[in-house]
Amino acid sequence: MSAVHSRTWYDDTSVSPGWQSSQVIHNENFDFCIIGGGLAGLSCAYHLAEKGASVALLEKSDIGAGASGRNGGFCSTGWAANNLQICRVIGENYSTEFEALGLEGLNWMRQRAFSRRYSKAEAVSGVISLGLSKNTPEDLKVLTKDKLEEFVIGPRYRWGIVDKSAFHFHPLNFLRIFAEETEKIGVKIIENIGLVKTNKTGVISSGGINLRCKRIVWATGGYGLDSNSILKKLVLPIQTFICVTSPMGAILDKYIPTNMALGDERRAGNYFRRLPDGRLLWGMGVSAMQQKPIHKIRSMGFQNIKAHFPDMVHHMEKDRITIDYAWSGLMAYASHFLPVVGQINDREFSLCGFGGHGMNTAPILGKKMANFLTGDSNSLHLFSRIPKQKTYGLLGRLGAEIEYRRLSFIDYLSERY
């Protein structure tokens, strides 16, 4: 599956790249080659170079063209798998260590995102988890309906929990600033290389790149899986959708009077936030099967917002507010919802499968992979416990689609009964 590519709001508000895509001498030698210019690949390359290794980072298109640069811009602790799933896969004794690793990733991101150097990442603290179900958690931090309406006014939202350690930001700007930092430490960033394949000595690309390297890390996420027959069997590309409205600051002041980001607790629920120019970013849905054209994503977005904010949409229609941007992106999911990280063969390693929760997990696992590749054999010990389960291609995608619809039905019942 490939996502329908269209220009995003991030593209139109991004900083200019602060690096020049490198030219590689034919058969140039490197210690490591990283395939994939998202957050995982950049982090791995950065931390390898920090340890003195020579590193080339290859990107099929542009840095941030994949999920890392076109997601909703949410960063929190945790993983795509919930704690029950984590305990079932790796064992209860290791779940606390796994949770700590997710928190370490969040702290790594916060340290950069809120620094002066990363000011264009426009980081804002606070994410509110919204509940639509009638089952309110027994938590002293829960915002009841009346308190919740200080932050969001929508008839279906019953309760909320504020996470002040989480934040939202401009992911493409973050990535471009980090790429500049990565290049300055000595990594050769090579963009627009096309499709790649490996051989006994290194990497060859359809764009004419031919380089030698000792080890290769695949950090392609939901993109580029066709280039690696092993990862293609272990990870499914799952599509999700985002739209952005035209500016409507006054309307948002009434219905979403907070600068914190918001998202509901459903497995494939909605996530949304105000953007600095007065627009609303709205994320929605997943699909393992369908490729939606842009006009359908726009229509779906408007109807989705209306289903949760009918009064707000009435004002939007009155003021002729439109959906100015709509796009899709591919997340990489393994069947157990945990990352596929570790050794593929003697020379190749995988760093993917973050499942829509990669803004904290991808950079910290990029760092751990770099530690592993430079001699710390214990840095990935948790991931040796995660089984490599086949996803079975089309059958797996069909199964994922059925599972999504099953979970959606459960969410529907929990909201009404």
Model feature map: region roles:
Residues 70-101:
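Glycine-rich active-site loop/strand segments that organize a redox cofactor
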Residues 160-201, 205-214, 219:
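Helical element adjacent to the flavin cofactor pocket in flavoenzyme catalytic cores
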Residues 165, 288, 292-303, 307-413:
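C-terminal catalytic lobe of FAD-dependent flavoproteins
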Residues 50-70:
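Glycine-rich FAD pyrophosphate-binding loop
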Residues 32-57:
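N-terminal Rossmann-like FAD-binding beta1-loop-alpha1 element of flavoenzymes
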Residues 115-123, 210-250, 254-346:
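Active-site substrate-recognition segment that forms the wall
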Residues 2-13, 81-87, 110-177:
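Flavin (FAD/FMN) cofactor-binding and adjacent substrate-gating region
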Residues 1-32:
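Extreme N-terminal leader/targeting segments of oxidoreductases
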